[in-house]
């Protein structure tokens, strides 16, 4: 079983869903970030509970070389969309999508399936297949 599968099983056993795993460097510190979602929202107690359960797993199978901080959090209101499930869960939200031709499409995600998405932009509906998407994220208008 891979580390990601172990993390996913642990997160799901505690009533949450694994959204994403990322590694990054902030303020000269390595961070292993586990983003989760929960029905009803993610709270601090749930993050702490999952962190406590993941810590022994990560002690055995280190996710990064050297010292790192484990961070368990929600993906936030403005989050990256990387998987089909992310797009499916974001239907009805505002998204910003960049394709490989570096065109940027902003608008409401009105449809998503296993092959493509449809964004309602100010210029009309734009259909994009996943293999044409360079990056995508939800965004919030204040």
From Swiss-Prot:
This is Ribosome maturation factor RimP. It is found in: Cytoplasm. One of its GO terms (cellular component) is cytosol. Keywords: Cytoplasm, Ribosome biogenesis. Required for maturation of 30S ribosomal subunits. InterPro entries: Ribosome_maturation_RimP (IPR003728), RimP_C (IPR028998), RimP_C_sf (IPR036847), RimP_N (IPR028989), RimP_N_sf (IPR035956). Belongs to the RimP family. GO terms for biological process: ribosomal small subunit assembly; translation. It comes from the Bacteria. Its main location: cytoplasm.
